[in-house]
Amino acid sequence: MSPIALKIDVDTYRGTREGAMRLADLLERLDVRATFLFSLGPDHTGRAIKRAFRRGFLGKVKRTSVVQHYGVKTLMYGVLLPGPHIGRRCGEFMRGIAGRGFEVGVHTWDHVRWQDGVGQAGEPWTRRELTLARDQFTEVFGRAPQVHGAAGWQMNRYVPALQQELGFRYASDTRGTGPFLPVLDPGVGTVPQLPTTLPTLDELIGRSDLRAPDPVDHLLAVTAEQARDEVFTLHAELEGGVYLGAFERLLRAWRQRDRQLTDLAGYAARLSGNLPHCRIVSGTVAGRSGHLAVQAPARADVTH
C-alpha cells in the first residue's frame, strides 16, 4: 500500500517539553516512524494575537480551544512574559527524541515571526531566519539539518533557493498533492518539496461538510478513496495533548488497513528522479485561516 509520511510540527516551548515527548512515547510503543520538526529560537506565541483580525481565525478559535491546547502561560510569551529560548533550554529533550531513532529537522527559528513576516520579507531577512535556525539545530544535534518544514506553511520566493544553498536535502513547506521540484526564477530548484496532502485534525474539528462527522473517520475515508502517497502533518501541541487519543485511533486504523507509516526521510528515499516542476503559489485550505504556500499544477515548459 502507498505510504503515509508523518510530519510533526513542534511550535512552542511547552510543545517541545511535553507534547513531543508524549508523541514519541506513543509512536515508539506502536513502532511507527515520524519526523519531528523543531522551533529552535524564542517562543513568542503570545504575539500571534494579531491574527485575531485575520478572516477565519476567530471561527477556528471557536471550534478549537486555543487556551486548552497551548496553555495560558504560552499565550503570554512575547507579550506579558519573556519568550523562553527553545533551542537553548530544550536541547536535552530534542536530542532525546533523536536518540530514540526519530528523524529530526528544522521547523523555524521564531515561529510567530516567520509565520507572520516571511510573506512580505526580502532575501536578507529570510536568509537570517533560516541561518539562525540551521545554526541552532547544528548546535543542538552536532550535525546539520537535512529537512525543513516552514511554520504555518508560509514561504516567499527566496526560500527554495536558500534551502538549496544552506544544504537542506528535502523540504515539506507547502500544501499540495504530491512531491515536486519548485520552479524558481529562473530555473528549477533541486530541493524536493514533499507537500502536506491531507487536512490536519484541527482543520476538521467542528466542520459540517465532512465525509463523516468524526474527523478521524473522515481522514480514513479520504485516504481509502485516494489510495496514493500522503503526507500528514500533526502538531505537538494538539496531537501531543488533547488529540492524542484521536491520533492513536487514526494510527491503529491506518495500520489495520495496511498503510505503511513512515517519516519524511523514508518518503524521500522513494522518490523517482523525474519529479514534476511546479510553482509555489498563495492559496487557501478549508479549515485553515489565511493564505498558505500551495503547489500549483505542473509546468512542462520549465527546465533546469
Pin down the residues of each PLM region.
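Catalytic alpha-helical scaffold of carbohydrate-active enzymes acting on polysaccharides/glycoconjugates
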Residues: M1-V147, G152-P192, A212-F232, E239-H304
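Short, glycine-/Ser/Thr-/acidic-enriched flexible segments
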Residues: P199, E237-E239
